[in-house]
Regions:
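Thr-Gly-centered strand-to-loop micro-motif
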Residues: 22-23, 45, 68
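Beta-alpha-beta core module
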Residues: 57-101
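Secondary-structure junction motif
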Residues: 15-39, 104-106
Length: 124
């Protein structure tokens, strides 16, 4: 996971830090809140959504920073790190699961290979 912000807005300099997070039970949300708590960094949840598109929109608009999986962070967003006062995030486990009924489907086989290739390239 990585912290992301908009290159047009220095949101990461604000205190408390405005943060966009996923729903309450999300591992991504827990990782973000845990990281900020370990740093003693004051933060305020300003956007809450289960939608990746919503998280990205909140960051693009300069509303907040967000913790996203590296493979879902669009290249036009800025990856933030220690030089921005943001500490590391806990890794998130990712699994690709397919049903027995999908065995032998060329379309599912292709999608399965593509997902695995994408995750490997992202270092997951």
């Amino acid at each position: 996971m990585v912290w992301v912000g908009s290159p047009q807005f220095d949101v990461w300099q604000r205190s408390p830090l405005p943060v966009a997070v996923y729903e309450e039970a999300s591992p991504g949300r827990r990782s973000a809140i845990h990281s900020l708590s370990l740093q003693g960094r004051p933060y305020k949840v300003v956007y809450n959504s289960a939608s990746l598109a919503g998280q990205i929109a909140a960051v693009e608009s300069g509303l907040a920073v967000a913790a996203l999986t590296q493979c879902s962070a669009p290249p036009h967003l800025q990856v933030l790190g220690p030089e921005h006062g943001l500490g590391p995030l806990e890794p998130m486990q990712v699994a690709v699961v397919r049903s027995r009924a999908s065995q032998g489907s060329k379309a599912v086989d292709s999608l399965h290979r593509l997902l695995l290739q994408t995750l490997r390239q992202a270092g997951l």
